Curated annotation (Swiss-Prot):
A biological process from GO: homophilic cell adhesion via plasma membrane adhesion molecules
Residue runs in coiled coils: none
A family per Pfam: Cadherin_2
Transmembrane parts of this sequence: 697-717
Origin: domain of life: Eukaryota
Lineage: Eukaryota, Metazoa, Chordata, Craniata, Vertebrata
GO CC annotations, alphabetized: plasma membrane
Record's compositionally biased regions (Polar residues): 774-786
Organism, as annotated: Pan troglodytes (Chimpanzee)
Signal sequence segment: 1-28
Annotated spans, 5 X 4 AA repeats of P-X-X-P: 773-890
Protein name per the record: Protocadherin alpha-5
């Protein structure tokens, strides 16, 4: 029997244990506790072991933890099954002031599905000291108050809970007051100042006390407040409220006038001392008074302004109930108003610009501005997202929560768009959601990245010569797409030398307007083409710019009248006398009028006309239209007048034409008298010239020696230059120029001509030019006529020495063309048959593309010298004389008058051959030879 009882008891105990185990496994509830502010990795518990799970089955069964709140506070290590702290846990932030604070977790495993509930209690630590709302409180106490009278004080608050929030108060030692702390049903401390000894206002009007609040944590934390007690004269029974603290809940969007609470206080006194009025206490802040209003008679508190949960989610209003006695007494209570949040705030954005204006060459990802977004609402109404308008070279980059950076996403070009107006939109997560926009003006700062450009790389300008000094000839303009200083352009000349003078002595350019001015009158005879560069530079750092080339063609004007070459021996009154035998036939050349014109083109194309004398009969003479040769038109007979006064008009083809006149006196003599007259004239000239013969001989020898040395130097220099590599802006050698002057007056020059062109480089030296008829002729050019070369021009001495009456050197007519103005040259072909000896045909017409001239005086062309022979004559630069170095035979005799005559030469030569032994005739030949040299 006893045995059976014992077995029955054991069975019952086993059954009870199984029931408890089954109940525990079915509930799946685990409890852990950790202190707040635990560090990351703090051990919480062996959750796998406590749940009866093996470590090897955690992963296969998909062990996972879910949280109802923040899921990142706790984490489970699947390797060892330990629950640990993953992030900082702040109990005050997590649970506010709730007595119990727990983190609820749900552990879920599959195969089979099981759910376990885990509760982790967060223990409070003493990390918040007590705090008073004010650093000083003021009380007014009547001196008639009896000992043990109590005066409410605003207590301190502690964010902690439990023992850490259990506050103890103490007062600095004094003989009048003490502290008393009461706790209501909500365990809220109600602090009162207790009067222990009667006050005497006449003895002490003011008392200063220090209240110290100490919490119950370890270690203890404290807070203090100053009490200023003013002693008043007043009353016996004070009004009293039903409660010392009233709690009210109110929506934050409650309109103005909404009733918050109606207070009721009572006073045991009678009469006027029983009548009570209600006021806000002196402890109430002005901000609270602006949002609430109290009816002093009824005690109703109403909303007076806009409430905002985000500004303040609770208000503590201290109310005084004061009787109307002469010495009023007051009662006190506190109304705590707690606000409930609604989604009534749009997101807020704060934009801080860091890099404005933005340079257009700023690198990508440059931070332009920082944008901070926030929403004063809480909960789901609080999260904010930010976005930027599309199709702009910027983007938003989220750096931290509620922080965005506005960065450069693609390259900028200020010349395309200088200002970007960006719109940033911020939107919260409420329902319905609220949004806000903000504008950001991004100005693009200019950098000097645009080269100054002219409309074209080269300009061609035509300017007439003899312009007034300082005249405006052209305006250059360059465009720059930059701004401000980078677009300020200044123009300047690229200074070079033009010949022996600087470019700035010819032209100048205005630095701001780009106007080009001629500083002096331009002379076509000096400069035909002025080529230079104008530079445009901006004011950027570093400055940018470019150059443009100006080709200024100086157009010729007919400003030079034909100039007659002075005769060797003049007649009376500036006229020239010529003796002509009566036996000459038609076409006999009597004399030649020589004239030159410094102009070019048609302005230098000379023609000759014979002006008839008034009242005179038809004379038997004529003048070549373009040669200036005076010849007979018919045979002379005995009936002709013995003397003729011929007036030759020399006229150019300019507009208007300019003229010069020459007078020739022609005397008709018998055939035997002409040589005698010539001999007498020559003999008369020997006397005054004899003194100069020796000097001229020495001078000729010296000049020939110097010229030979200089010719050798020039030949050596030319050979070196031709062997060297040609460079830019250096005059290269052209075809040889052939200018011949012989006894019969025939001369020519090659088709290749070098025109005067003044550029930025110095022209080649042409101080000495030797001309030899023995130079080989270059191959006939079949190319199109080239532009005139400005590097070479005839000197005044060469002009004076030419036998041609038509001086067409550089007589081109400027015509605009693709490559510049072309030169049209009046020409006479050397192959054209001559109608009469001593004349040349007039030019076929302007525009004939030929630069070759051959003038023929006398019955035939002169014979060209051989390669080894010396030239008949050469020209000394700076001297109007053409020196003859040809050796004449001893019996030769040449007679020349002031103007070159040809028919008389041939007749004289025949007579000289018949009289070789005559000594007097030899003297005449020597005199005539000297005269010829002077004339040339």
């Amino acid at each position: 029997m006893v045995y059976s009882r014992r077995g029955s008891l054991g069975s019952r105990l086993l059954l009870l244990w199984l029931l408890l185990a089954y109940w525990k496994a079915g509930s799946g509830q685990l409890h852990y506790s950790i202190p707040e502010e635990a560090k990351h990795g703090t051990f919480v518990g062996r959750i796998a072991q406590d749940l009866g799970l093996e470590l090897a089955e955690l992963v296969p069964r998909l062990f996972r933890v879910a949280s109802k709140g923040r899921g990142d506070l706790l984490e489970v290590n699947l390797q060892n099954g330990i629950l640990f702290v993953n992030s900082r846990i702040d109990r005050e932030e997590l649970c506010r002031r709730r007595a119990e604070c727990s983190i609820h977790l749900e552990v879920i495993v599959d195969r089979p599905l099981q759910v376990f509930h885990v509760e982790v209690a967060v223990k409070d630590i003493n990390d918040n000291p007590p705090r008073f709302s004010r650093q000083e409180q003021t009380l007014f106490i009547l001196e008639s108050r009896m000992p043990d009278s109590r005066f409410p004080l605003e207590g301190a608050s502690d964010l902690d809970i439990g023992a850490n929030a259990q506050l103890r108060y103490r007062l600095n030692p004094n003989e009048y007051f003490d502290l008393d702390v009461k706790t209501n049903e909500e365990e809220t401390n109600f602090l009162e100042l207790v009067l222990r000894k009667s006050l005497d206002r006449e003895e002490t009007q003011e008392h200063r006390l220090l209240v110290i609040a100490t919490d119950g944590g370890k270690p203890e934390l404290t807070g203090t407040v100053q009490l200023l007690i003013n002693v008043l004269d007043a009353n016996d029974n004070a009004p009293e409220f039903d409660k010392s603290i009233y709690n009210v809940r109110l929506l934050e969007n409650a309109p103005s006038g909404t009733l918050v609470i109606k207070l009721n206080a009572s006073d045991a006194d009678e009469g006027i001392n029983k009548e009570i009025v209600y006021f806000f206490s002196n402890l109430v802040l002005d901000d609270v008074k602006s949002k609430f209003i109290i009816n002093s008679n009824t005690g109703e508190i109403k909303v007076n302004g806009e409430l905002d949960y985000e500004d303040c989610n609770s208000y503590e209003i201290n109310i005084d109930a004061v009787d109307k006695s002469t010495f009023p007494l007051s009662g006190h209570c506190k109304v705590v108003v707690k606000l409930l949040d609604v989604n009534d705030n749009t997101p807020e954005m704060a934009i801080t610009t860091l890099f404005l204006p933005v340079k257009e060459d700023a690198p990508l990802s440059t931070v332009i501005a920082l944008i901070t977004v926030s929403d004063r609402d809480s909960g789901a109404n609080g999260p904010v997202t930010c976005s930027l308008m599309p199709h702009v070279p910027f983007k938003l980059v989220s750096t931290f929560k509620n922080y965005y950076s506005l960065v450069l996403d693609s390259a900028l070009d200020r010349e395309s768009l200088s200002v970007y107006e960006l719109v940033v939109t911020a939107r919260d997560g409420g329902s319905p959601s609220l949004w806000a926009t903000a504008s950001v003006s991004v100005e693009v700062a200019d950098v000097n990245d645009t080269l100054r450009a002219f409309a074209q790389p080269q300009y061609t300008v035509f300017v007439k010569e003899n312009n007034p000094p300082g005249c405006h000839i052209f305006t250059v303009s360059a465009r720059d797409a930059d701004a401000q200083e980078n677009a300020l352009v200044s123009y300047s000349l690229v200074e070079r030398r033009v010949g022996e003078r600087p470019l700035s002595s010819y032209v100048s350019v205005h630095a701001e307007s780009g106007k080009v001015y001629a500083l002096q009158p331009l002379d076509h005879e000096e400069v035909e083409l002025l080529q230079f560069q104008v530079s445009a530079r901006d004011a950027g750092v570093p400055p940018l710019g470019s150059n443009v080339t100006l080709q200024v063609f100086v157009l010729d004007e007919n400003d030079n009248a034909p100039a007659l070459l002075a005769p060797r021996v003049g007649g009376t009154g500036g006229a020239v006398s010529e003796l002509v035998p009566r036996s000459v036939g038609a076409g006999h050349v009597v004399a030649k009028v020589r004239a030159v014109d410094p102009d070019s083109g048609y302005n230098a194309w000379l023609s000759y006309e014979l002006q008839p004398a008034p009242g005179s009969a038809r004379i038997p003479f004529r003048v070549g239209l373009y040669t200036g040769e005076i010849s007979t038109t018919r045979s002379l007979d005995e009936t002709e007048a013995p003397r003729h006064r011929l007036l030759v008009l020399v006229k150019d083809h300019g507009e208007p034409p300019l003229t010069a006149t020459a007078t020739v006196l022609v005397s008709l003599v018998e055939s035997g008298q002409a040589p005698k007259a010539s001999s007498r004239a020559s003999a008369g000239a020997v006397g005054p010239e004899a003194a100069l013969v020796d000097v001229n001989v020495y001078l000729i020898i010296a000049i020939c020696a110097v010229s030979s040395l200089l010719v050798l130097t020039l030949l050596l220099y030319t050979a070196l230059r031709c062997s060297a590599q040609p460079t830019e802006a250096v005059c290269t050698r052209g075809k040889p120029t052939l200018v011949c002057s012989s006894a019969v007056g025939s001369w020519s020059y090659s088709q290749q001509r070098r025109q005067r062109v003044c550029s930025g480089e110095a022209p080649p030296k042409t101080d000495l030019m030797a001309f030899s008829p023995s130079l080989p002729q270059g191959p006939t050019s079949t190319d199109n006529p080239r532009q005139p070369n400005p590097d070479w021009r005839y000197s005044a001495s060469l002009r004076a020495g030419m036998h041609s009456s038509v001086h067409l050197e550089e007589a081109g007519i400027l015509r605009a063309g693709p490559g510049g103005p072309d030169q049209q040259w009046p020409t006479v072909s050397s192959a054209t048959p001559e109608p009469e000896a001593g004349e040349v045909s007039p030019p076929v017409g302007a525009g004939v593309n030929s630069n070759s001239w051959t003038f023929k005086y006398g019955p035939g062309n002169p014979k060209q010298s051989g390669p080894g022979e010396l030239p008949d004559k050469f020209i000394i630069p700076g001297s109007p004389a053409i020196i003859s170095i040809r050796q004449e035979p001893a019996n030769s005799q040449i007679d020349k008058s002031d103007f070159i005559t040809f028919g008389k030469k041939e007749e004289t030569k025949k007579k000289k051959k018949k009289k070789k032994g005559n000594k007097t005739q030899e003297k005449k030949e020597k005199g005539n030879s000297t005269t010829d040299n002077s004339d040339q």
